[in-house]
Regions:
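C-terminal motif of bacterial Sec signal peptides marking the signal peptidase cleavage site
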Residues: 16-19
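N-terminal segment of the mature soluble domain
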Residues: 31-76
Length: 161
């Protein structure tokens, strides 16, 4: 196959994919331009602000009448034993990350109900690999915070539509 044929086939495939409505996964178009983040400063607040800014949403004070107000009420992490070995040693842990929040739109008089976002992961544990398992747990916690940001962003989108 020569170069022209390869380019033609690539173009044909690209046309077929775009004509069926396919698009890369990512953040959707934002239906609001201003938001106020209120309440507690959580461990993921800084990254949430980055996501909002990258989507061209201005973070303003509540007194500036934002289109949407989000109150971050709190967060909590939990770790519990999922399974034990025959000798009574921990084999698996389950970790949770929860964020409590509520939303108020510009046209509503009161805050919406308190919502909870929860993410969960489990991982194996071994006393012989303590350092690597601690690093794995740290990475899983970071992953859960990022998932919570994505989920909160999606909930904000749903409330504004």
């Amino acid at each position: 196959m020569n170069t022209i044929q390869k380019k033609f086939i690539a173009l044909l495939i690209l046309l077929m994919i775009t004509s069926c409505g396919f698009h890369m996964r990512g953040m959707t178009e934002i239906s609001f331009k201003t938001i106020s983040l209120e309440g507690k400063e959580l461990s993921f607040t800084k990254n949430l602000k980055k996501v909002l800014n990258s989507n061209k949403v201005a973070i303003v004070l509540p007194s500036e009448n934002p289109e949407l107000r989000v109150e971050l009420i709190g967060e909590e992490s939990e770790k519990r034993i999922l399974s034990l070995s025959g000798q009574g040693l921990v084999r698996e842990y389950e970790i949770f990350y929860r964020v409590r929040y509520r939303i108020k739109t510009a046209d509503s008089e009161t805050w919406g109900q308190e919502n909870i976002l929860e993410t969960r992961r489990d991982f194996t544990y071994s006393d012989s690999n303590v350092i690597s398992k601690e690093e794995e747990e740290r990475q899983l916690n970071e992953s859960m915070r990022n998932e919570a940001i994505t989920n909160l962003f999606n909930q904000i989108q749903l409330n504004k539509k």
